[in-house]
Amino acid sequence: MFRILLFLATNIAVVLVASVTLRLLGVEPYLQGSGLNLTSLLIFCAVFGMSGAMISLFLSKWIAKMSTRTQVIEQPRDAVESWLLDTVRELSSEAGIKMPEVGIFPAHQSNAFATGWNKNDALVAVSEGLLRRFSKDEIRAVLAHEIGHVANGDMVTLALIQGVINTFVMFFARIIGNIVDKAVFKNENGHGIGFFITTIFAEIVLGILASIIVMWFSRKREFRADAMGAKLAGSGAMIAALQRLKAETQMPNEMPDTLTAFGITEGVKQGFKALFSSHPPLDERIAALAANR
Protein backbone atom coordinates (compact mmCIF):
# COMPACT_ATOMS: atom_id res chain seq x y z
CA MET A 1 0.00 0.00 0.00
CA PHE A 2 2.84 2.40 0.87
CA ARG A 3 4.41 1.95 -2.57
CA ILE A 4 1.09 2.63 -4.30
CA LEU A 5 0.60 5.80 -2.24
CA LEU A 6 4.19 6.82 -2.97
CA PHE A 7 3.59 6.23 -6.67
CA LEU A 8 0.41 8.34 -6.67
CA ALA A 9 2.08 11.10 -4.67
CA THR A 10 5.01 11.12 -7.08
CA ASN A 11 2.69 11.42 -10.05
CA ILE A 12 0.74 14.27 -8.46
CA ALA A 13 3.94 16.09 -7.49
CA VAL A 14 5.44 15.80 -10.96
CA VAL A 15 2.19 16.93 -12.59
CA LEU A 16 2.07 19.99 -10.34
CA VAL A 17 5.72 20.84 -10.97
CA ALA A 18 5.27 20.36 -14.72
CA SER A 19 2.14 22.50 -14.77
CA VAL A 20 3.73 25.34 -12.78
CA THR A 21 6.90 25.21 -14.88
CA LEU A 22 4.98 25.33 -18.16
CA ARG A 23 2.91 28.27 -16.91
CA LEU A 24 5.97 30.20 -15.71
CA LEU A 25 7.68 29.66 -19.05
CA GLY A 26 4.55 30.73 -20.90
CA VAL A 27 4.40 27.39 -22.71
CA GLU A 28 1.06 26.07 -21.41
CA PRO A 29 -1.12 28.80 -22.98
CA TYR A 30 0.71 28.28 -26.29
CA LEU A 31 0.13 24.53 -26.17
CA GLN A 32 -3.54 24.92 -25.30
CA GLY A 33 -3.90 27.49 -28.04
CA SER A 34 -2.49 25.01 -30.53
CA GLY A 35 -5.03 22.40 -29.50
CA LEU A 36 -2.92 20.26 -27.13
CA ASN A 37 -4.81 19.39 -23.94
CA LEU A 38 -2.25 18.68 -21.22
CA THR A 39 -4.64 16.75 -18.97
CA SER A 40 -5.73 14.43 -21.77
CA LEU A 41 -2.13 14.03 -22.89
CA LEU A 42 -0.98 13.10 -19.38
CA ILE A 43 -3.79 10.55 -18.97
CA PHE A 44 -2.90 9.03 -22.35
CA CYS A 45 0.79 8.80 -21.45
CA ALA A 46 0.05 7.43 -17.96
CA VAL A 47 -2.15 4.65 -19.34
CA PHE A 48 0.45 3.52 -21.86
CA GLY A 49 3.50 4.21 -19.68
CA MET A 50 2.18 2.36 -16.64
CA SER A 51 0.60 -0.43 -18.68
CA GLY A 52 3.94 -1.42 -20.19
CA ALA A 53 5.64 -1.53 -16.79
CA MET A 54 2.80 -3.46 -15.13
CA ILE A 55 2.50 -6.00 -17.95
CA SER A 56 6.25 -6.63 -17.70
CA LEU A 57 5.92 -7.07 -13.93
CA PHE A 58 3.06 -9.57 -14.15
CA LEU A 59 4.87 -11.56 -16.86
CA SER A 60 8.26 -11.32 -15.15
CA LYS A 61 8.38 -14.90 -13.84
CA TRP A 62 7.39 -16.40 -17.18
CA ILE A 63 9.82 -14.16 -19.09
CA ALA A 64 12.63 -15.03 -16.65
CA LYS A 65 12.05 -18.75 -16.97
CA MET A 66 11.98 -18.60 -20.77
CA SER A 67 14.93 -16.24 -21.26
CA THR A 68 17.26 -18.05 -18.85
CA ARG A 69 15.92 -21.57 -19.47
CA THR A 70 15.40 -21.90 -15.74
CA GLN A 71 14.25 -25.30 -14.54
CA VAL A 72 12.00 -24.94 -11.50
CA ILE A 73 12.62 -27.61 -8.86
CA GLU A 74 9.29 -29.38 -8.40
CA GLN A 75 10.69 -32.58 -6.92
CA PRO A 76 14.39 -32.55 -5.92
CA ARG A 77 16.46 -34.99 -7.96
CA ASP A 78 19.54 -34.96 -5.73
CA ALA A 79 20.96 -33.72 -2.44
CA VAL A 80 21.92 -30.32 -3.89
CA GLU A 81 18.38 -29.57 -5.02
CA SER A 82 16.96 -30.76 -1.69
CA TRP A 83 19.39 -28.47 0.14
CA LEU A 84 18.42 -25.53 -2.10
CA LEU A 85 14.72 -26.00 -1.35
CA ASP A 86 15.33 -26.36 2.39
CA THR A 87 17.57 -23.29 2.46
CA VAL A 88 15.14 -21.08 0.55
CA ARG A 89 12.27 -22.31 2.73
CA GLU A 90 14.22 -21.41 5.87
CA LEU A 91 15.32 -17.98 4.59
CA SER A 92 11.90 -17.00 3.29
CA SER A 93 10.34 -17.98 6.62
CA GLU A 94 12.85 -15.79 8.46
CA ALA A 95 12.11 -12.93 6.06
CA GLY A 96 8.36 -13.30 6.62
CA ILE A 97 7.37 -14.13 3.05
CA LYS A 98 5.79 -17.11 1.32
CA MET A 99 8.35 -19.52 -0.08
CA PRO A 100 9.13 -18.59 -3.70
CA GLU A 101 9.66 -21.04 -6.52
CA VAL A 102 13.27 -22.22 -6.70
CA GLY A 103 15.08 -22.87 -9.95
CA ILE A 104 18.45 -23.52 -11.58
CA PHE A 105 19.50 -22.01 -14.90
CA PRO A 106 22.32 -23.14 -17.22
CA ALA A 107 25.17 -20.61 -17.09
CA HIS A 108 28.89 -20.96 -16.40
CA GLN A 109 28.89 -17.52 -14.77
CA SER A 110 28.12 -17.40 -11.05
CA ASN A 111 24.86 -15.48 -10.75
CA ALA A 112 21.37 -15.58 -9.30
CA PHE A 113 18.18 -13.57 -9.62
CA ALA A 114 14.78 -13.04 -8.06
CA THR A 115 11.64 -11.92 -9.83
CA GLY A 116 7.86 -12.00 -9.52
CA TRP A 117 4.94 -9.60 -9.34
CA ASN A 118 4.71 -9.68 -5.53
CA LYS A 119 6.66 -11.00 -2.57
CA ASN A 120 4.35 -13.99 -2.10
CA ASP A 121 4.50 -15.13 -5.72
CA ALA A 122 8.18 -14.93 -6.60
CA LEU A 123 10.95 -16.97 -8.21
CA VAL A 124 14.53 -17.31 -6.97
CA ALA A 125 17.03 -18.99 -9.28
CA VAL A 126 20.76 -19.70 -9.22
CA SER A 127 23.18 -20.57 -12.01
CA GLU A 128 24.88 -23.92 -12.42
CA GLY A 129 28.24 -22.13 -12.23
CA LEU A 130 27.41 -20.67 -8.83
CA LEU A 131 26.45 -24.10 -7.49
CA ARG A 132 29.73 -25.58 -8.74
CA ARG A 133 32.13 -22.95 -7.40
CA PHE A 134 30.56 -21.43 -4.28
CA SER A 135 30.58 -22.97 -0.82
CA LYS A 136 27.27 -23.71 0.88
CA ASP A 137 27.66 -20.70 3.17
CA GLU A 138 28.29 -18.44 0.17
CA ILE A 139 25.34 -19.88 -1.77
CA ARG A 140 23.15 -19.35 1.29
CA ALA A 141 24.28 -15.72 1.42
CA VAL A 142 23.46 -15.22 -2.27
CA LEU A 143 20.03 -16.78 -1.74
CA ALA A 144 19.50 -14.52 1.29
CA HIS A 145 20.38 -11.50 -0.89
CA GLU A 146 17.77 -12.54 -3.46
CA ILE A 147 15.20 -13.22 -0.72
CA GLY A 148 15.99 -9.68 0.44
CA HIS A 149 14.97 -8.33 -2.97
CA VAL A 150 11.68 -10.21 -2.70
CA ALA A 151 10.96 -9.21 0.91
CA ASN A 152 11.79 -5.56 0.16
CA GLY A 153 9.38 -5.55 -2.79
CA ASP A 154 12.12 -4.38 -5.15
CA MET A 155 10.48 -5.79 -8.29
CA VAL A 156 7.27 -3.85 -7.63
CA THR A 157 9.16 -0.69 -6.67
CA LEU A 158 11.26 -0.70 -9.83
CA ALA A 159 8.18 -1.39 -11.97
CA LEU A 160 6.39 1.61 -10.44
CA ILE A 161 9.45 3.81 -10.95
CA GLN A 162 9.77 2.62 -14.54
CA GLY A 163 6.08 3.29 -15.11
CA VAL A 164 6.42 6.87 -13.85
CA ILE A 165 9.51 7.37 -16.00
CA ASN A 166 7.72 5.95 -19.06
CA THR A 167 4.78 8.29 -18.46
CA PHE A 168 6.80 11.46 -18.31
CA VAL A 169 9.17 10.53 -21.12
CA MET A 170 6.12 10.13 -23.37
CA PHE A 171 4.51 13.28 -21.95
CA PHE A 172 7.44 15.67 -22.39
CA ALA A 173 8.49 14.13 -25.71
CA ARG A 174 5.07 14.98 -27.14
CA ILE A 175 5.18 18.50 -25.73
CA ILE A 176 8.57 19.03 -27.38
CA GLY A 177 7.27 17.50 -30.60
CA ASN A 178 4.25 19.80 -30.61
CA ILE A 179 6.37 22.92 -30.01
CA VAL A 180 8.85 22.05 -32.77
CA ASP A 181 6.03 21.14 -35.17
CA LYS A 182 4.29 24.49 -34.67
CA ALA A 183 7.26 26.83 -34.15
CA VAL A 184 9.81 25.37 -36.57
CA PHE A 185 7.78 23.54 -39.19
CA LYS A 186 4.92 26.09 -39.04
CA ASN A 187 2.34 23.34 -39.13
CA GLU A 188 -1.10 24.59 -38.03
CA ASN A 189 -3.22 21.64 -39.20
CA GLY A 190 -2.92 18.75 -36.75
CA HIS A 191 0.39 16.97 -36.24
CA GLY A 192 2.80 16.92 -39.15
CA ILE A 193 5.95 14.97 -39.89
CA GLY A 194 7.93 17.37 -37.69
CA PHE A 195 5.90 16.30 -34.65
CA PHE A 196 6.46 12.59 -35.20
CA ILE A 197 10.18 12.85 -35.97
CA THR A 198 10.83 15.18 -33.03
CA THR A 199 8.74 13.06 -30.65
CA ILE A 200 10.63 9.88 -31.53
CA PHE A 201 13.99 11.62 -31.17
CA ALA A 202 12.95 13.22 -27.86
CA GLU A 203 11.70 9.87 -26.51
CA ILE A 204 15.06 8.27 -27.28
CA VAL A 205 17.08 11.07 -25.66
CA LEU A 206 14.77 11.45 -22.64
CA GLY A 207 14.57 7.67 -22.27
CA ILE A 208 18.36 7.40 -22.09
CA LEU A 209 18.56 10.20 -19.53
CA ALA A 210 15.66 8.74 -17.52
CA SER A 211 17.33 5.33 -17.37
CA ILE A 212 20.07 6.97 -15.28
CA ILE A 213 17.43 7.67 -12.63
CA VAL A 214 16.11 4.10 -12.73
CA MET A 215 19.61 2.65 -12.44
CA TRP A 216 20.38 4.97 -9.52
CA PHE A 217 17.40 3.53 -7.64
CA SER A 218 18.52 0.03 -8.63
CA ARG A 219 21.98 0.58 -7.17
CA LYS A 220 20.49 1.86 -3.91
CA ARG A 221 18.30 -1.21 -3.47
CA GLU A 222 21.34 -3.50 -3.93
CA PHE A 223 22.77 -2.19 -0.67
CA ARG A 224 19.46 -2.98 1.05
CA ALA A 225 19.43 -6.51 -0.37
CA ASP A 226 23.03 -7.00 0.78
CA ALA A 227 22.02 -5.85 4.26
CA MET A 228 19.17 -8.35 4.29
CA GLY A 229 21.55 -11.05 3.07
CA ALA A 230 23.91 -10.24 5.93
CA LYS A 231 21.05 -10.28 8.42
CA LEU A 232 19.77 -13.69 7.28
CA ALA A 233 23.05 -15.44 6.43
CA GLY A 234 25.68 -13.49 8.36
CA SER A 235 27.94 -10.61 7.32
CA GLY A 236 30.96 -12.87 6.91
CA ALA A 237 29.20 -15.17 4.45
CA MET A 238 27.74 -12.23 2.49
CA ILE A 239 31.13 -10.55 2.20
CA ALA A 240 32.77 -13.85 1.19
CA ALA A 241 30.17 -14.35 -1.55
CA LEU A 242 30.77 -10.85 -2.95
CA GLN A 243 34.54 -11.36 -2.83
CA ARG A 244 34.19 -14.57 -4.81
CA LEU A 245 32.00 -12.73 -7.32
CA LYS A 246 34.68 -10.05 -7.58
CA ALA A 247 37.19 -12.71 -8.65
CA GLU A 248 34.90 -13.54 -11.58
CA THR A 249 34.26 -9.99 -12.85
CA GLN A 250 36.10 -10.66 -16.12
CA MET A 251 33.74 -13.49 -17.04
CA PRO A 252 31.12 -12.59 -19.68
CA ASN A 253 27.69 -11.70 -18.29
CA GLU A 254 25.28 -14.44 -19.39
CA MET A 255 22.22 -12.85 -17.77
CA PRO A 256 19.60 -11.44 -20.21
CA ASP A 257 19.46 -7.63 -20.16
CA THR A 258 15.89 -7.73 -18.84
CA LEU A 259 17.08 -9.56 -15.71
CA THR A 260 20.45 -7.91 -15.07
CA ALA A 261 18.96 -5.51 -12.51
CA PHE A 262 17.67 -8.46 -10.49
CA GLY A 263 20.89 -10.50 -10.53
CA ILE A 264 23.46 -10.66 -7.76
CA THR A 265 26.04 -8.88 -9.94
CA GLU A 266 26.76 -7.58 -13.45
CA GLY A 267 29.82 -6.74 -15.52
CA VAL A 268 32.14 -3.95 -14.40
CA LYS A 269 31.38 -0.53 -15.93
CA GLN A 270 33.73 2.44 -15.85
CA GLY A 271 33.32 6.21 -16.25
CA PHE A 272 30.11 7.45 -17.86
CA LYS A 273 28.89 3.88 -18.35
CA ALA A 274 28.76 3.46 -14.57
CA LEU A 275 25.71 5.77 -14.54
CA PHE A 276 23.83 3.04 -16.40
CA SER A 277 24.92 0.24 -14.07
CA SER A 278 22.19 -1.54 -12.11
CA HIS A 279 24.66 -2.65 -9.41
CA PRO A 280 27.18 -0.66 -7.34
CA PRO A 281 30.86 -1.69 -7.59
CA LEU A 282 31.51 -4.83 -5.57
CA ASP A 283 34.18 -3.01 -3.54
CA GLU A 284 31.57 -0.47 -2.37
CA ARG A 285 29.14 -3.22 -1.44
CA ILE A 286 31.81 -5.10 0.52
CA ALA A 287 32.88 -1.89 2.29
CA ALA A 288 29.28 -1.10 3.25
CA LEU A 289 28.84 -4.56 4.77
CA ALA A 290 32.16 -4.37 6.59
CA ALA A 291 31.24 -0.97 8.05
CA ASN A 292 28.00 -2.37 9.50
CA ARG A 293 29.39 -5.58 11.00
UniProtKB/Swiss-Prot annotation:
Keywords attached to this entry: Cell inner membrane, Cell membrane, Hydrolase, Membrane, Metal-binding, Metalloprotease, Protease, Transmembrane, Transmembrane helix, Zinc
Cofactor(s) in the UniProt record: Zn(2+)
Molecular functions per Gene Ontology: metalloendopeptidase activity; zinc ion binding
Membrane disposition: Multi-pass membrane protein
UniProt-listed GO biological process terms: proteolysis
Pfam families noted in UniProt: Peptidase_M48
Transmembrane parts of this sequence: 2-22, 38-58, 156-176, 193-213
One of the record's GO cellular component terms: plasma membrane
UniProt subcellular location: Cell inner membrane
EC annotation from Swiss-Prot or TrEMBL: 3.4.24.-
Catalytic residues (UniProt): 146
KW Cell membrane (keyword) present: yes
Residues binding Zn(2+): 145, 149, 222
Gene3D superfamilies: Metalloproteases ('zincins'), catalytic domain
InterPro entries membership: HtpX_protease, Pept_M48_protease_HtpX, Peptidase_M48
Note accompanying the cofactor annotation: Binds 1 zinc ion per subunit.
Principal localisation: membrane
Keyword presence, Nucleotide-binding: no
Family note: Belongs to the peptidase M48B family.
PANTHER family per UniProt: PROTEASE HTPX (PTHR43221:SF1)
NCBIfam families: PRK05457.1
Protein's name in the database: Protease HtpX
Recorded name of the encoding gene: htpX
